[in-house]
């Protein structure tokens, strides 16, 4: 498994090189809507560390021209979560997000830490709903990487991984915002490579209450954190349903029965 970790690490470093060269803000207007900005709604996607290795192709295909303008900022800061917050605020001002009738937000893991802090500092009255993409599995990786692979973590993400690992999640308190939690049930390949360390951690629960975040609805998908970039079309209908209604519709409310690591056990 150590050989696999080295190979995977090299691939991630290559992905980082591509990310640094090609990362950019994604701003896409809904072609079907010619109304002024004050009558339009927008989706803001705050990705996470996985955006280093994955493109926004599936995100764009899943959320573009669905009645919303789509914004995916290149906001990650190698320095800190505070740096991420500053980048989000700069993006929000540049693209006049406060002028929209409603803004709906999809937060990945780093995005969740960033969004909550950003909203506390720069509250926008038109934030209507937020979906938090959370993973009891993937959220163990920042501390693991900090402790076992500090050099690799610093090469990939600078100080951001360390800041994330050392910062307890602070939930957003905003009664006027509809909040949903989408829970991933599948492990990533990288966590599989850290499986021995993962087994030494306290047991993980998929109970939505464990995330310490108020929610109006929750759902489960057998998707990994990588899949939430490359296969988000599978979860997009439920996310869009939440943005429009405040519920995940017919999405699964029971924890996934599958082994989170089953995909990788087959190839062991």
What is the role of each PLM region?
Residues 172-268:
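C-terminal catalytic-base region of ester-bond hydrolases, centering on the histidine
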Residues 9-17:
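Bacterial N-terminal signal peptides
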Residues 57, 141-146, 190-195:
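Short aromatic-enriched loop/helix-cap "lid" or pocket-rim segments at secondary-structure transitions
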